[in-house]
Each structure stands twice: as C-alpha cells, then as structure tokens.
Amino acid sequence: MATRLSDAEIEERLGDLTGWTRQGNEIRKTFQLPSFPSAIAFVVNVAFLAEAAGHHPDIDIRWRKVTLSLTTHDAGGLTQKDFDLATQIDEIM
C-alpha cells in the first residue's frame, strides 16, 4: 500500500502542478477542451495512463469540460501515486 502524504508534503507537491487544487483528501483539476469529441478522446488517453499506472481517477464529463479527481482509496488520502498520475495527465494535455 502507498504511504499517505502529510499536509506539508501535499502542499509542496501541489506547488509543482498547474491548476490542480486540493479538495479534502483528493486533488482535482478541470480541463477545458475545444469540443465534446476532443473531451472524450482526452478521457480515453487518461484511461490508458491510469490503467498503466494501476491508479484510476474519478472522471466527470460535461460537454467540453472534464474534471478529474485523484485520491488513493486504500491509503485513505493522497499519496505520491496521485501526484505522479496528475503529472502524467498534464503532460498529455
């Protein structure tokens, strides 16, 4: 099981990400895409990253907006896995 991060570690790692915010025990970001099909294509790419990492975000799709939420359920909060996947997601955007 991944080790849960402290509040200080979470804030430090959030400083390395753009647009991700902490919402309790998760980090969240909303992506604005040019069209609904491009939003779906983005989600498919995120799905492949998530599957490869063995770590899956909660996904909310609203027309051209995709909101991703990351947390490590078995650790009961945020772990390095969440920040690693957030970084990978940002790299494909």
From Swiss-Prot:
Keyword tags: Lyase
Family annotation (Gene3D superfamilies): Transcriptional coactivator/pterin dehydratase
Domain of life: Bacteria
Molecular-function annotations in GO: 4-alpha-hydroxytetrahydrobiopterin dehydratase activity
SUPFAM superfamilies: PCD-like
Reactions catalysed, as given in the entry: (4aS,6R)-4a-hydroxy-L-erythro-5,6,7,8-tetrahydrobiopterin = (6R)-L-erythro-6,7-dihydrobiopterin + H2O
Top enzyme class: lyase
Gene Ontology BP, a term: tetrahydrobiopterin biosynthetic process
Family to which this protein belongs: Belongs to the pterin-4-alpha-carbinolamine dehydratase family.
Record's protein name: Putative pterin-4-alpha-carbinolamine dehydratase
EC number: 4.2.1.96
Keyword flag Lyase: yes
